[in-house]
Design a protein with these regions (language model features):
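Positively charged, low-complexity intrinsically disordered leader regions
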Residues: 1-37, 41, 110
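Active-site cofactor/substrate anionic-group-binding motifs, chiefly glycine-
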Residues: 23-77
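Glycine-rich phosphate/diphosphate-binding loop of Rossmann-like nucleotide-binding domains
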Residues: 29-42, 124-202
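Short, structured coil segments at secondary-structure junctions
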Residues: 46, 77, 97-98, 155, ...
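Active-site-proximal loop->helix
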Residues: 51-74, 97, 148-150, 168-182
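Anion-binding alpha/beta catalytic cores of soluble intermediary-metabolism enzymes, centered on
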Residues: 79-151, 242
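Rossmann-like adenosine-cofactor binding region
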Residues: 178-255
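Adenosine-phosphate binding glycine-rich loop
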Residues: 237-238, 243-284
Length: 284
């Protein structure tokens, strides 16, 4: 589908318009740049329309309507709901009462749409991801690392996580890893994770709404910064990925994110194409 768009303008719809006559409601409980724009563009390219709902502008967000009642109304109005939320429980509750598909646009537990874009970006750059080695540096217990661990099982790649013990994946995740025989290595040494890897990934050290001492967390994670010296330990054709927004000079240096191995801008673009596939899959 992406290849078929090569000669089309950015705002032009796909020729087959599979989402024509349909609409998506997007609820943003957290600020967003890429998720908001990419889903909006994705629905339009598929021939449909989107409605953006901010909590401070709807009854559910104001607390004078239950989530259940809001979900039932949305079922009557639209074909799909996308929710970006601080609480995964909200996502599960909406799913319980909706009679239409709901997409996780980000929660405190996972960020699956971003990971699908990352897989697409890797395979465009370096071929099949199966059997390859990805290194994750920084917080090993956030929504991105959780979804990456799940993806390692689905797409059969090797995953190495370098993180302080304090920020290791939680016990529930590790139990799932053991049960599903995921090829996961956890280390406190960044060099060990990155050595001979095919892709190096990281994320902002302090996420939105993190109830932590920001400066203390940054200090703990300082030695897990992705820099040129660390990237040199990866394979020569290894790529660097980051979901954005980025803390330049913190989790990654300018030299790396703006360097030849960085694919972060294509990664951001691929949010549109990955999410188009997700929307279409929901309707098929």
């Amino acid at each position: 589908r992406k290849l078929k768009r090569q000669n089309l303008n950015k705002s032009a719809p796909d020729e087959d318009k599979p989402f024509e006559g349909k609409s998506m409601a997007m609820i943003f409980e957290k600020p967003s740049t890429r998720t908001r724009m990419s889903f909006d563009i994705a629905t339009k390219q598929l021939g449909g329309s989107s409605i953006i709902l901010n909590p401070d502008g709807i009854h559910y967000g104001k607390g004078d309507e239950t989530l259940k009642d809001t979900a039932k109304v949305l079922t009557e109005y639209v074909d799909i709901v996308m929710l970006r939320t601080s609480s995964h429980k909200n996502l599960e509750e909406f799913g319980k009462y909706l009679n239409i598909p709901i997409i996780n646009g980000l929660s405190d537990v996972g960020h699956p749409c971003q990971i699908m874009s990352d897989i697409l970006t890797y395979e465009e750059s370096n071929g099949t991801i199966k059997g390859k080695t990805l290194a994750w540096l920084g917080d090993g217990n956030n929504n991105m690392s959780n979804s990456l661990i799940e993806a390692a099982g689905k797409f059969e790649f090797n995953l190495r996580i370098a993180c302080p013990k304090k920020y290791s994946p939680n016990k529930k995740i590790l139990s799932w890893v053991k049960k599903n025989k995921i090829n996961l290595t956890i280390t406190v040494k960044p060099d060990e994770a990155v050595k001979n890897s095919d892709c190096v990934m990281t994320d902002k050290w302090v996420s939105m709404n993190d109830k932590v001492n920001k400066e203390a967390k940054k200090k703990i994670l300082k030695s897990f910064q992705v820099n040129k010296k660390l990237m040199s330990k990866a394979n020569s054709d290894a790529i660097f990925m980051h979901c954005l927004p980025v803390g330049r000079g913190e989790e990654v240096t300018d030299e790396v994110i703006d360097g030849k191995q960085s694919v972060v801008w294509r990664q951001a673009l691929n949010r549109v194409h990955a999410q188009k596939s997700i929307i279409k899959w929901c309707l098929d």
